[in-house]
């Protein structure tokens, strides 16, 4: 077998909590350094320090896990029916299609749930990824995490096939 890796998707399970929290942290530390300082990265990654609380948040949303050879390599969550809350891929799997697979699945699920649009507050690192998928910038934002301020951009995509 050759070509790009194939990623399977499945629902988030409680036993995924530790590995998904690790993916979250490692993705932030390894992939966002060109856009955010070390203190900003540490503040951002601290959201997964309490694995139980992190798991509870993901368990309360529609959360999918991307796997390669049965091992989790990324995850994404849909808040409500029309907002991507999180989409993170392990640095070793970045750029191989796991993020695109997760985003496409959330877009289909949102449309199936009747959403006419999908929004995301994308980090400066992820903004280009979403723009290549047809998302359009709506506003620039600053949010505080502890003593740190992080910039992001709210983007929106009109969904085709949404049911009225």
What are these regions (language model features)?
Residues 8, 117-119:
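Residues at or immediately flanking beta-strands
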Residues 11-14, 22-94, 103-109, 113, ...:
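Acetyl-CoA-dependent GNAT
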Residues 119-121, 136-154:
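Conserved catalytic-core motifs of GNAT/GCN5-like acyltransferases
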Residues 126-127, 146:
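Short secondary-structure capping/turn micro-motifs that flank functional sites
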Residues 130-131, 135:
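Conserved active-site tyrosine of GNAT-family acetyltransferases
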């Amino acid at each position: 077998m050759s070509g790009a890796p194939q990623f399977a998707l499945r629902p988030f399970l409680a036993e995924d909590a530790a590995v998904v929290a690790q993916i979250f942290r490692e993705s932030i530390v390894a992939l966002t350094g060109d856009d955010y300082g070390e203190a900003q990265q540490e503040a951002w990654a601290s959201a997964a320090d309490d694995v139980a609380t992190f798991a509870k948040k993901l368990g309360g949303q529609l959360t999918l896990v991307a796997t390669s050879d049965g091992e989790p390599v990324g995850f994404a969550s849909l808040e409500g029916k029309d907002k991507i809350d999180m989409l993170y891929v392990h640095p070793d799997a970045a750029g191989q299609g796991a993020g695109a697979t997760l985003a496409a699945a959330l877009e289909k699920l949102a449309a199936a749930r009747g959403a006419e649009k999908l929004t995301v507050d994308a980090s400066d690192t992820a903004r280009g990824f979403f723009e290549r998928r047809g998302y359009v910038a709506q506003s620039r934002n600053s949010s505080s995490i502890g003593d740190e301020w992080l910039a992001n951009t709210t983007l929106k995509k009109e969904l085709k096939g949404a049911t009225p």
